[in-house]
């Protein structure tokens, strides 16, 4: 007789604080996992970028070269390069191993809110308060961007990249998706200034957070509103949102010191995770495991599921 398929385990949410990193770089403006989730980057108001092993709590390298606070960073797919952007209007390409600045791209007229590599890490995309997205060729010596996307009518707060698409959120209340294969631009009007936008892991949906304390799940192709998620507070700051590693939950920072988890399908609040007494400025979700990083003030907290047991020396 055939045995029944085992039921998939219900998703576990990261709610056990495993580590707190005192980052020593002023206020942490953003925290980001690298591509495989083994390391993380922290962006500091003291102009530095730091690379950590978050589970062990060890600092691996400090990157100095920005002239003002660092606001966002990303790692390349092969872990050899980093990019960052900040209040000095510059986009910086770093060599991970040496800690050296490889290139510094200038051209934005205001602070750089968000940076991403394309999948091959040959191009850096940067979104700025100057209402533009600029595409910089990592291999060229030319100082100007290879392309500028200037459809936004106000600052660009968020840029994400999939294999042939760019997703951008703007303070003008629109989320724009550039299909590079088709050469088309799709735009959806949310109405409230957008603070963060991202693709679902399966690539079917986009998640958008805005300053009306609401997250919206949209069908990527049609723009249809699939769900709304409320209960957190986001009225003043650029806060991160994302989906959990299996697309089961919507996750958002909040200005009241918590991280909120909602069931993606039901829309019901699943967990309000108390982080501290300030604004949870940034978060990052592990690509394959129930592991969350949160940034508040000058520290980063690493969270795992309740059943998690740290390996030797990692707890």
Curated annotation (Swiss-Prot):
Keywords carried by this UniProt record = Cytoplasm, Lysosome, mRNA processing, mRNA splicing, Nucleus, Repeat, Spliceosome, WD repeat
Which coarse location class describes where this protein primarily resides? Answer: cytoplasm
Q: List the disulfide bonds.
A: none
Q: Does the keyword Nucleus apply?
A: yes
Q: Which GO terms describe its biological process?
A: inflammatory response to wounding; mRNA splicing, via spliceosome; neural tube closure; placenta blood vessel development; regulation of canonical NF-kappaB signal transduction; response to hypoxia; response to lipopolysaccharide; RNA splicing, via transesterification reactions
What exactly does this protein do? Molecular scaffold protein for various multimeric protein complexes. Acts as a module in the assembly of a multicomponent scaffold for the ERK pathway, linking ERK responses to specific agonists. At low concentrations it enhances ERK activation, whereas high concentrations lead to the inhibition of ERK activation. Also involved in response to hypoxia by acting as a negative regulator of HIF1A/HIF-1-alpha via its interaction with EGLN3/PHD3. May promote degradation of HIF1A. May act by recruiting signaling complexes to a specific upstream activator. May also be involved in pre-mRNA splicing.
Q: How does it assemble?
A: Interacts with EGLN3/PHD3. Interacts with ERK signaling proteins MAP2K1/MEK1, MAP2K2/MEK2, LAMTOR3, ARAF/Raf-1, MAPK1/ERK2 and MAPK3/ERK1. Identified in the spliceosome C complex. Interacts with PARD6B and CRB3. Interacts strongly with GTP-bound RRAGA but not with inactive GDP-bound. Interacts with p62/SQSTM1.
Q: What is this protein called?
A: WD repeat domain-containing protein 83
UniProt organism field: Homo sapiens
